[in-house]
Amino acid sequence: MILRVLILLAITAHPALAQNMSAEDFDRYTRGKTLFYGQNGAAYGVERYLDRRRVVWSFLDGQCNDGVWYEDNGQICFVYDNNPDPQCWTFQQGPNGLIAQFENDPTATELYEAEDIGEEMLCYGPDVGV
C-alpha cells in the first residue's frame, strides 16, 4: 500500500495558480474520506474526515490522534487531543487532489494528497503490557 502512495506522489503535478478552498468546499471534498498525504515524494500521514468537522490523524505509525477542524482567517485549522496548538493550513484543489500549505507560507511544509484509499486507516490501541 505504501508503494502505491509513493508512486502516486511521484507523479503528482503542482497546479499553476489554484484558489484556496473555503471551509464549505473543504468539508464537501473531505467528509467521509480517508486521505493519504505526501511530501517531497514520500508518505507523510493519513487523515480520516468525519461528520461535524471531526478528524483522526496518523503519521502512518499506527498512533492515531482525534481532533477537530475549523476555519480561521481563510485557513483550515486543526486541533488534536494530543496537541492543543492549532495547526493551520490553506488547501487548494489541484488536478490530482488536495495541496496543503502550512500557515499559507510558501517556504513552509507543503503536502500533496496521494489518494482516497476507500478503506480504514490503521490505528493501534493504547500501549499495553507488563
Regions inferred by a protein language model and the residue ranges of each:
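Sec-dependent signal peptide recognition
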Residues: 1-8
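Lipid interaction determinants
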Residues: 16-66, 72-130
